[in-house]
UniProtKB/Swiss-Prot annotation:
<dbReference type="InterPro" id="IPR036175">
    <property type="entry name" value="Sec23/24_helical_dom_sf"/>
</dbReference>
<feature type="region of interest" description="Disordered">
    <location>
        <begin position="1"/>
        <end position="58"/>
    </location>
</feature>
<keyword id="KW-0813">Transport</keyword>
<dbReference type="GO" id="GO:0000139">
    <property type="term" value="C:Golgi membrane"/>
</dbReference>
<dbReference type="GO" id="GO:0090110">
    <property type="term" value="P:COPII-coated vesicle cargo loading"/>
</dbReference>
<keyword id="KW-0256">Endoplasmic reticulum</keyword>
<dbReference type="Pfam" id="PF04810">
    <property type="entry name" value="zf-Sec23_Sec24"/>
</dbReference>
<dbReference type="InterPro" id="IPR041742">
    <property type="entry name" value="Sec24-like_trunk_dom"/>
</dbReference>
<dbReference type="GO" id="GO:0005789">
    <property type="term" value="C:endoplasmic reticulum membrane"/>
</dbReference>
<feature type="binding site">
    <location>
        <position position="296"/>
    </location>
    <ligand>
        <name>Zn(2+)</name>
    </ligand>
</feature>
<dbReference type="InterPro" id="IPR036465">
    <property type="entry name" value="vWFA_dom_sf"/>
</dbReference>
<comment type="function">
    <text>Component of the coat protein complex II (COPII) which promotes the formation of transport vesicles from the endoplasmic reticulum (ER). The coat has two main functions, the physical deformation of the endoplasmic reticulum membrane into vesicles and the selection of cargo molecules.</text>
</comment>
<keyword id="KW-0862">Zinc</keyword>
<dbReference type="GO" id="GO:0006886">
    <property type="term" value="P:intracellular protein transport"/>
</dbReference>
<dbReference type="InterPro" id="IPR006895">
    <property type="entry name" value="Znf_Sec23_Sec24"/>
</dbReference>
<protein>
    <recommendedName>
        <fullName>Protein transport protein sec24</fullName>
    </recommendedName>
</protein>
<keyword id="KW-0333">Golgi apparatus</keyword>
Length: 950
């Protein structure tokens, strides 16, 4: 198939283009070989000027030998050979002149460490642009770029990969028929570069004038809703033939607080909806009859425009309807009138269940929890002053606390102990859930005293099941959140659990049984809670077996989450800080209450399956007693009838009560073009959304079938895609290669990362609690965090570019070094590396790291003096230490990824010649290496090729 012209189709890139940046003008001969016409989203050229400003410290490095320096080349690098052995000069990759390999003694610097470098422009050094969708740009707008780096940068900026967010544009009429170009690539010869995972999805190219206003925000941004297909097949048979999944990845909130991610709010309570399908009016409807009526873009019914639609009741004057938010913005929030409420909006209610058994007291869990709640009372949402709190302590009995109002004279908090666990009665419910505002002082004094009350508790009993039933009875009339803080296995009363971890089962086909619930109480109780608008969050801290598999059912069906802190102990400062920070952010997060989510779509499309933490109340309604802001949901879409329109719409609506007691509906409308052409479907497929769908599907298999079935799923689906592409679009056999579209080039690495993930990989060394907690993350993490969890980020720090670790002059955001592929072949023995999967960070110190590096980063003379394990970097007065700390902090920054999260990852310091088990753990994150029964990336690709050729 003839290659299309290089820049045809906005935002498209020929296969080799990602990540191999020419540093010098490319000679024609090399250009013909297929070297890139433009690099990924880095506008690195202007940073040359920064080089001479500050004299940097000199450290040893072979940094600039083409194949060994971690940041020397990113893209199709040749694999590094044996550590430290001189290498043959590498070919000029992507137009780099070949460099002479110099023989270097480990310690001897060739180029000073961190000094001005003939550095490659940092690929991932700039954050990828805000991934907006585009409604297309005429080909003429993307002319051939002039030569050289400046030209390439200009070319990139015209393609919308510059530093500024690319605003979607209304499509000019002459570009009708513009589609994403299909660029086949050979997976074996044009390796994937990790920077591609941060690129925006293929643009959504709609027909001209699809929306009623030319607003750049008329279509939904990918941070809220992403489709696995940005061009939808018109028939079920074409979708089936493609073997691609059609699903939406939905994350209604991109931050924990509204202020961090405001969306337009329609305050006037005029909500225009279709009479038949109940869709909300949106930018893709059509107005008829001089604007008095509108045609629904989902079911085609004609509806009347409400009279108040063009009238501002507050100001008593007519308004310009074209300014209304719901016609200009795909994501809006309507303030709901009375008919959207079953009862008055509920207040925010938190009921804390404290484990006060010996385990919880001795590890410091009780004291740290009480202290954190005390310190966070001002952060708990309470703008309407209706927020209520309640406290129950749990060992082999239930301890209720009745907190008096601050106005009561000599008001003392009283404790009531109930030992009858079969029918725990509720003493004085009115005094157990108290308004935060009216009882603030007494709540503070209670939290101060709580740890002392149980300081000498020797009980090992934990009747958490009975406590949950009592708590449910207490808050069911109002609804709200039950927050469980537990560090032992529930072993008495309702829902008691046995120690069932059996090392002999790990790594065998029977292991899956350990991931399923051991007591039906947890699932049936969770469904009961969901009906009464009660959500449960679990914070689990055991150093022993805790049966996370059973306990995680409670959050799974009530819109909650499970947080697991294995081996946690407050005596370790890092443990105490991590939990206190996460728990405080959790308490401060805004949540929706009494929420339901529904997805409607153009006639012919049907929502077939829903994945995520909620209860599926009917075929298309998902119920959330509380709606969190740090989770995503996946909805599979079926094509039931042939699609006749040239674009379809999918509208997600979340009806909820805000923390301030206001009933609202958040509406997100996504429009996608349709196509009859298989090549268009493949060219517009979104690899990150597909990997997210596979992740949710694999977790469902792990919990419902077996771990083997879960592991096989990504491999089987990927093989089907490769076979289909080869047969239908690959032009036959194509010699020894493995053909796939360039926009899906990262999918094999993501699928390998998923099968080797701690939640799924075959191993006899993974405790079932660790596995169960990982499955909770794999099925809830927002897409950007999930990609990093499956395929972690690896940064080389000892030779990072000069602009890394310092603020970008334009955005003032810290610049990260370019990410590297997860292979130990990229490591040099004198290197310093950061491996980060978003939950845990590892700082890897090479076995030959030079003393100056050790001194500057850790403040000690000898490598052997570097303390390994959980830790924090000392703040030292030198440039390089500050840059390394900045990179570690920036890598943890969720806001810059466009998601809300409370997670504060632990940092583990790993010496290559240090603690073997720690080193082994860090190495399991190197997805492309062979480890613990898992194959290397090369073996994986070889196996896929064999399966495809068969």
């Amino acid at each position: 198939m003839a290659a299309p012209p290089p820049n045809d189709g906005y935002g498209q890139y020929p296969p080799q283009q990602y990540g191999e940046q020419p540093q010098y003008p490319v000679e024609p001969a090399q250009q013909a070989y297929g070297s890139p016409a433009s690099p990924p989203p880095a506008a690195a050229s202007q940073h040359g000027a920064e080089h001479g400003k500050k004299k940097k410290r000199a450290y040893a490095a072979q940094a600039f030998e083409v194949a060994t320096g971690g940041n020397a080349v990113v893209g199709g690098q040749p694999a590094a050979t044996q550590y430290g052995i001189p290498q043959p000069a590498a070919p000029g990759f992507g137009g780099y002149p070949a460099q002479d390999a110099q023989q270097v003694a480990y310690g001897a610097p060739t180029t000073p460490y961190g000094a001005p470098q003939p550095a490659v422009p940092g690929v991932g050094g700039y954050q990828a642009p805000d991934p907006y969708y585009s409604q297309g740009v005429p080909p003429a707008a993307v002319g051939p770029a002039p030569g050289g780096v400046a030209g390439i940068t200009a070319g990139i900026q015209s393609m919308g990969f510059g530093g500024q967010p690319q605003q979607p544009q209304q499509l000019p009429a002459q570009t009708r028929g513009l589609v994403n170009q299909l660029y086949p690539t050979d997976l074996l010869n044009q390796p994937f570069n990790v920077a591609e995972l941060e690129l925006p999805p293929p643009p959504i190219i709609l027909p001209p004038n699809s929306s009623v206003t030319p607003s750049p925000d008329a279509n939904c941004a990918p941070k809220y809703v992403r489709s696995t297909l940005n061009a939808v097949p018109t028939t079920h048979s074409l979708l089936k033939k493609s073997k691609l999944p059609f699903a939406l990845v939905i994350q209604p909130y991109a931050a924990l607080h509204d202020l961090d991610d405001p969306v337009p709010v329609v305050q006037d309570q005029v909500i225009s909806r279709c009479r038949r399908c109940r869709s909300y009016i949106n930018p893709f409807v059509t107005f008829l009859d001089h604007g008095h009526r509108w045609r629904c873009n989902m079911c085609n019914l004609t509806n009347d425009v409400p009279q108040a639609f063009d009238w501002d009741a507050a100001a008593q004057k007519s308004v310009d309807r074209w300014q209304r938010p719901e016609l200009n913005h795909a994501v809006v929030e309507f303030v709901a009138p009375q008919e959207y409420m079953v009862r008055p909006p509920q207040p925010l209610v938190y009921l804390f269940l404290f484990d006060v058994s010996y385990a919880a007291v001795s590890t410091g869990l009780l004291a740290t929890s009480a202290r954190t709640i005390l310190d966070s009372l001002d952060r708990i949402p309470n703008a309407d002053r209706r927020t209520r709190l309640g406290f129950i302590a749990v060992d082999s009995s239930l301890h209720y606390f009745s907190v008096p109002r601050d106005t009561e004279e000599n008001g003392e908090t009283s404790m009531l102990v109930v030992s009858d666990l079969d029918e725990p009665f509720l003493p004085v419910p009115g005094e157990l859930l108290v308004p935060l505002t009216e009882c603030r002082q007494n709540i503070e004094s209670f939290l101060n005293k709580l740890p002392e009350m149980f300081a000498n508790n020797q009980s090992n009993g934990n009747c958490m099941g009975s406590a949950l039933r009592a708590g449910h009875k207490l808050i069911a009339p109002l609804g709200g959140k039950i927050v469980v803080l537990s560090s032992s296995l529930p072993n008495v009363g309702y829902g008691k659990l046995e120690m069932r971890e059996d090392k002999k089962l790990l790594g065998t086909s029977k292991e899956s049984g350990l991931l399923q619930t051991a007591n039906s109480f947890y699932k049936s109780f969770a469904v009961e809670c969901s009906k009464n608008q009660v959500s449960i969050d679990m914070f689990l801290f055991s150093s022993q077996y805790q049966d996370v598999a059973s306990l995680s059912n409670l959050p799974r069906y009530t819109g909650g989450q499970t947080w697991f802190y294995p081996g946690w102990n407050a005596a370790r400062a890092e443990d105490a800080v991590k939990f206190a920070s996460e728990f405080s952010d959790y308490l401060s997060s805004e949540i929706g209450l009494e929420a339901v989510l529904r997805v409607r779509a153009t006639t012919g499309l049907r929502m077939s399956t829903f994945y995520g933490n909620f209860f599926n109340r009917s075929s298309d309604l998902c119920a959330f007693p509380a709606f969190p802001r740090d989770q995503c949901y996946v909805v599979e879409v079926a094509i039931d009838e042939n699609l006749t329109k040239n674009f379809v719409c999918l509208q997600t609506a979340v009806l909820h009560t805000t923390c301030n007691g206001e009933r609202r509906i958040r509406v997100m409308t996504l429009a996608l073009p349709t196509t009859t052409n298989l090549a268009d479907v493949y060219a517009s497929a979104d690899q990150c959304a597909i990997a997210t769908y596979f992740s949710h599907k694999a977790v469902e298999k792990a919990l419902g079938n077996s771990l083997d079935a879960a592991r096989d799923l990504p491999q089987q689906k990927l093989t089907e895609l490769l076979q289909t592409f080869r047969k239908e679009l690959g032009g036959g056999s194509m010699g020894g290669g493995l053909q796939f579209p360039s926009n899906l080039r990262g999918l094999p690495a993501l699928c390998l990362g998923l099968t080797k993930h701690v939640g799924l990989r075959k191993s006899a060394l993974i405790p079932s609690d660790i596995r169960s907690a990982a499955l909770c993350q794999l099925s809830t993490l927002p897409l950007p965090l999930l990609m990093q969890y499956i395929y972690p980020r690896l940064y080389s720090l000892h030779d990072m570019p000069d602009n890394a670790g310092i603020p970008d002059p334009e955005t003032s955001q810290i610049v990260l070094p370019p990410p590297m592929n997860l292979s130990s072949e990229r490591f040099v023995p004198f290197g310093l590396y950061l491996i980060d999967d978003g939950q845990t960070q590892f700082l890897w110190v090479g076995r030959d790291a030079v003393p100056q590096l050790i001194l500057d980063v850790f403040g000690v003379q000898e490598r052997t003096q570097v303390a390994v394990g959980k830790g924090t970097l000392p703040e030292l007065d030198n440039d390089f230490n500050e840059r390394v700390r900045n990179v570690i902090a920036k890598s943890r920054d969720h806001k810059s990824k466009g998601v809300g999260s409370i997670t504060l990852p632990h940092l583990y310091i790993v010496r290559e010649d240090g603690e073997p088990s720690l080193k082994l753990w860090a190495q399991t994150l190197l997805v492309e290496d062979r480890a613990d029964q898992g194959m290397s990336f090369q073996q994986w690709m070889g196996m896929l090729r064999e399966k495809v050729v068969q």
